[in-house]
């Protein structure tokens, strides 16, 4: 619990240690912010709806020697999200930014987008009650995808051709777009994602690699086009000047510029029966939640039996176990290499293996995964 809750939309430039004082002044003249303050009382969350506000806050924190840990979400927060925020808060010398943005470009089914649970008041209450997030970024769609700027596009090769990528065409292209845009807006030092969406984690890891390569390419092009380019054509007159510019970043207002954060994975959080926590669980009945616990119970069979069965036998037994659960419709059960997601045909060909599942129940699609070995 650090300061009052302030609604900053838009926010004035916040400088140095005056950020909280200026924010307090700002909220006093915002009727909407005042109502929100009365609703939620004291907490430590600054709320921003535009890039100028969050970027001003981040610059202020950086001037004070803090780094930024970023937890992007689509809202409908649960204990798994809060655990990521808590892990972020325990990183050294950080300020924690959580975002809520339901990204339309990663939904291949419009009905799924419409049905996605949204409860911003509850989300804010959870963050406020926890008291570990320093800022909540809730951008509008035009802030994330400005009409005047085309979106960057990404290809993730084999990572997007299996499981979620195969079943949800265009899903990971949308994930790449939104993560790239949010990282451009937030400029974080750390990016925290959950283990439950493990395939997404690998996709984002590859996205960061591509952004790093893109930034190096842009830096080289900038040097090549410099009017001060020397005989070497690299944009520098001499070795001393070249050395000074070796780590020179591009201007942060360029659409394609990104700070490349350190990627951190948080462990999957489960209820007392093993069901992986998910925003989609809110759409299940109590009976549906009880049945859904059988997903993780079945996946654990692979960890217990992999030394005694072939990969194909393991998958078939899990399918039989889930077929006995009423109202289940299994979309896939897949054994995959933990690093490449290549299908596992023989245990000995892989140093680390996970098993993945996608199952429908009560019209809700649930995914889960767990380590088989090591």
Task: Label each region the model flagged.
Residues 14, 22, 27, 225, ...:
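Cationic, low-complexity basic patches in intrinsically disordered or flexible, solvent-exposed regions
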Residues 5-8, 14, 218, 250:
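Leucine-biased recognition of intrinsically disordered, low-complexity hydrophobic segments
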Residues 342-344, 354-374:
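Short, basic/aromatic-enriched C-terminal tail that caps enzymatic domains
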Residues 7, 11, 15-16, 26-31:
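Cationic, amphipathic, low-complexity segments that mediate targeting or membrane/lipid association
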Residues 330-348, 356:
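A conserved acidic, glycine/proline-rich C-terminal tail/linker
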Residues 1, 7, 36-39:
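Methionine residue identity
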Residues 38-226, 231, 235-327, 336, ...:
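Nucleotidyltransferase catalytic core that binds NTPs
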């Amino acid at each position: 619990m650090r300061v009052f809750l302030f609604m900053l939309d838009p926010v004035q430039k916040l400088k140095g240690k005056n950020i909280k004082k200026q924010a307090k002044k700002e909220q006093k003249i915002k009727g909407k912010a005042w109502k929100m303050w009365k609703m939620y009382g004291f907490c430590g969350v600054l709320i921003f709806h535009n890039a100028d506000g969050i970027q001003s806050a981040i610059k202020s924190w950086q001037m004070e020697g803090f780094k930024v840990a970023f937890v992007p979400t689509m809202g409908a927060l649960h204990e798994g999200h809060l655990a990521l925020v808590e892990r972020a808060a325990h990183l050294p010398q950080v300020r924690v930014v959580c975002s809520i943005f339901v990204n339309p470009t990663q939904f291949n089914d419009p009905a799924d987008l419409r049905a996605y649970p949204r409860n911003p008041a509850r989300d804010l209450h959870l963050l406020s009650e926890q008291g570990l997030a320093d800022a909540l970024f809730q951008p509008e769609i035009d802030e994330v995808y400005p009409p005047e700027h085309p979106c960057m596009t990404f290809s993730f090769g084999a990572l997007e051709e299996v499981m979620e990528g195969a079943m949800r065409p265009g899903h990971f292209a949308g994930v790449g777009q939104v993560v790239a845009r949010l990282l451009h807006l937030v400029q974080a030092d750390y990016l925290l994602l959950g283990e439950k969406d493990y395939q997404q984690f690998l996709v984002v890891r590859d996205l960061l690699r591509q952004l790093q390569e893109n930034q190096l390419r842009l830096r080289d092009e900038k040097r090549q086009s410099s009017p001060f380019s020397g005989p070497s054509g690299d944009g520098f007159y001499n070795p001393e000047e070249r050395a000074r510019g070796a780590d020179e970043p591009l201007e942060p207002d360029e659409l394609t510029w990104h700070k490349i954060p350190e990627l951190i994975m948080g462990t999957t959080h489960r209820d007392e029966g093993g069901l992986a926590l998910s925003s989609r669980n809110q759409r299940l009945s109590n009976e549906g939640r009880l049945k859904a616990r059988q997903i993780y119970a079945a996946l654990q069979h692979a960890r217990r039996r992999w030394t005694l069965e072939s990969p194909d036998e393991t998958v078939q037994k899990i399918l039989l176990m889930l077929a006995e659960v009423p109202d289940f419709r299994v979309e896939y059960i897949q054994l995959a290499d933990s690093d490449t997601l290549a299908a596992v045909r023989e245990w000995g060909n892989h140093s680390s293996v996970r098993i993945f599942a996608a199952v429908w129940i009560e019209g809700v699609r649930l995914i889960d995964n767990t380590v088989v070995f090591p």
